[in-house]
A protein has these predicted regions:
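Histone-fold recognition with a strong bias for associated Lys/Arg-rich disordered tails
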Residues: 1-188
Length: 188
């Protein structure tokens, strides 16, 4: 299937892999595909997302923030406070004893074998679905090549909950889809 991907669409998937690794994610999720798209897409496609308030820097910052807060978030801190445990004090004590990075999520352990040698990070089921939907979008439009905009349509068609939140919810997604489709129509 990847032989049908344009150079930009391939670069977006490659960039998704790179971003997932940099953000210390053990998997490539839909959010990483969106981030990869925003990193390499044509200016017109990036502009469509930027007008909706979705930029590469914003998505990356939100993913980094989510990753940093993932082990124990604010709700967990409140629950622990209710039983007399100050999570901030525990964190400070651990960082004082073991260093500032003591609570950082470690870089995922590389797999062994052939996949490890090529630096493979697996796609989540949702991210795989987005890749497959990009092919379906291409076929439905009778286009020959899967481009970044097809990948964007697939993200908009099947966002996971995190991606939907980043994109601004269902209404924002509904407004983005025709704008991305219009880009493809102009290119055809």
């Amino acid at each position: 299937m990847f032989e049908r991907f344009s150079a930009v669409a391939k670069a977006a998937v490659t960039q998704a892999h790179k971003q997932a690794r940099e953000l210390r994610s053990p998997v490539i999720d839909v959010e990483h595909v969106l981030l990869g798209l925003l990193a390499v897409a044509e200016p017109a496609l990036r502009e469509v997302f930027a007008e909706a308030g979705v930029t590469q820097d914003d998505v990356r910052a939100r993913l980094a923030e989510r990753g940093a807060a993932a082990p124990l978030g604010e709700h967990d801190a409140e629950a622990l406070r209710s039983i007399g445990i100050d999570l901030d004090a525990v964190r400070a004590s651990l960082e004082a004893s073991f260093g500032e990075d003591a609570l950082e999520r470690s870089v995922p352990e590389p797999r062994r074998g052939l996949l490890a040698r090529i630096g493979h990070t697996p796609l989540t089921r949702e991210a795989k679905k987005v890749i497959e939907l990009s092919l379906r979008e291409t076929l439905a439009r009778k286009d020959r090549v899967i481009d970044a905009a097809h990948l964007a349509l697939a993200v908009l068609c099947a966002p996971n909950s995190g991606t939907a939140e980043i994109l601004g919810g269902d209404e924002a997604i509904a407004r983005l889809r025709p704008r991305v489709t219009a880009l493809l129509d102009r290119a055809a």
